[in-house]
């Protein structure tokens, strides 16, 4: 199908939703097949304009009296409001599926996905079997920010309803973290994309198999990082352990140090559908997603 078909289908779906809900509409996704996902607001005249991630979530998280609920910044599943759970549910393809949740303050949030698989190098893959349905799996999403041992850490995470998660992080995962940190710290080259590694089917918590997918890059000609191997290892262990211990089963942690070095670490439970398309898991961009630091992590250090 051409991108024009997806665009027409997209706006046609929105038109139907407006006719039914007569509410302010916020949505996530791409405008058409092949375009990057984003956050959007649709006006009464059907015009769509981009909004920031913070504005998107704060708006749809408003209570009936227009205030952000106290629990809005809580990451734990037991405390997170149902609003966040509802609006982050993903449909497989907006030409076939569309989820609408009518919230208590008359704001409708639509979450869509173009069923686009992204390879490690950022290229788009569209295999025939990609038309999967994820709208029963994603339970909640959060964006968090903190600093550990001098390393800036941000994470974009999802809790999948069908995946199992425990609260024990064992040395098995730590050994793999140490491997890729040593590779990231000591590797160097003359290209901006510094490489990637995959550690599949790591069974570290006694209940669930897990996999790690990591890639690093630099805005300088060298891929070296000035942070010590020990500090980076501690930052990764603390952040991943904290996310796992809060029940996250598919998440990406972005690490940055200085003005040039970046790393993305995707951690995926084997029961999560994202395990089949790990490089499609969203990662926060260091310079763009400016959510305030909250309690998403255990105590930050450094």
UniProtKB/Swiss-Prot annotation:
Q: Which residues form the signal peptide?
A: 1-23
Please indicate if the UniProt record lists Protein biosynthesis as a keyword: no
What keywords are assigned to this protein?
A: Glycoprotein, Signal
Q: What is one cellular component GO term in this UniProt entry?
A: mitochondrion
Tell me which Pfam families the record gives. DUF6736
Where on this protein are sugars attached?
65, 86, 93, 220, 231
Is GTP-binding there in the keyword field?
A: no
Q: Looking at the record's lineage, which domain of life comes first?
A: Eukaryota
Q: Which InterPro entries match?
A: CSS2_C
Q: Give the family per the record.
A: To yeast killer toxin KHR.
Q: What is this protein called?
A: Putative uncharacterized protein YER076C
Q: Which organism is it from?
A: Saccharomyces cerevisiae (strain ATCC 204508 / S288c) (Baker's yeast)
């Amino acid at each position: 199908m051409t991108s024009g078909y997806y665009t027409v289908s997209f706006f046609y779906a929105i038109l139907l939703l407006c006719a039914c809900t007569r509410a302010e509409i916020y949505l996530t996704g791409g405008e058409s097949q092949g375009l990057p996902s984003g956050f959007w607001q649709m006006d009464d005249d059907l015009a769509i304009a981009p909004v920031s991630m913070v504005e998107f979530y704060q708006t749809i998280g408003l209570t009936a009296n227009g205030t952000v609920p106290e629990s809005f910044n809580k990451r734990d599943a037991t405390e997170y409001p149902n609003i966040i759970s509802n609006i982050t549910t993903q449909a497989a393809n907006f030409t076939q599926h569309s989820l609408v949740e009518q919230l208590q303050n008359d704001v409708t949030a639509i979450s869509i996905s173009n069923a686009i698989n992204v390879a490690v190098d950022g290229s788009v893959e569209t295999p025939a079997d990609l038309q999967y349905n994820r709208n029963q799996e994603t339970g909640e999403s959060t964006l968090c920010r903190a600093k550990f041992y001098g390393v800036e850490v941000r994470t974009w995470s999802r809790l999948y309803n069908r995946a199992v998660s425990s609260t024990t992080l064992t040395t098995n995962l730590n050994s793999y973290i140490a491997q890729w940190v040593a590779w990231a710290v000591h590797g160097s080259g003359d290209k901006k994309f510094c490489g990637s590694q995959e550690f599949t089917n790591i069974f570290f918590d006694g209940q669930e198999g897990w996999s790690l997918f990591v890639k690093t890059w630099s805005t300088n000609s060298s891929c070296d990082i000035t942070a010590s191997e020990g500090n980076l290892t501690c930052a990764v262990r603390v952040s991943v352990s904290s996310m796992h211990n809060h029940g996250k089963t598919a998440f990406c942690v972005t690490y940055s140090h200085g003005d040039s070095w970046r790393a993305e670490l995707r951690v995926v439970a084997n029961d999560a559908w994202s395990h089949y398309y790990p490089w499609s898991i969203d990662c926060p961009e260091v310079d763009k997603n400016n959510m305030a630091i909250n309690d998403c992590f255990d105590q930050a250090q450094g």
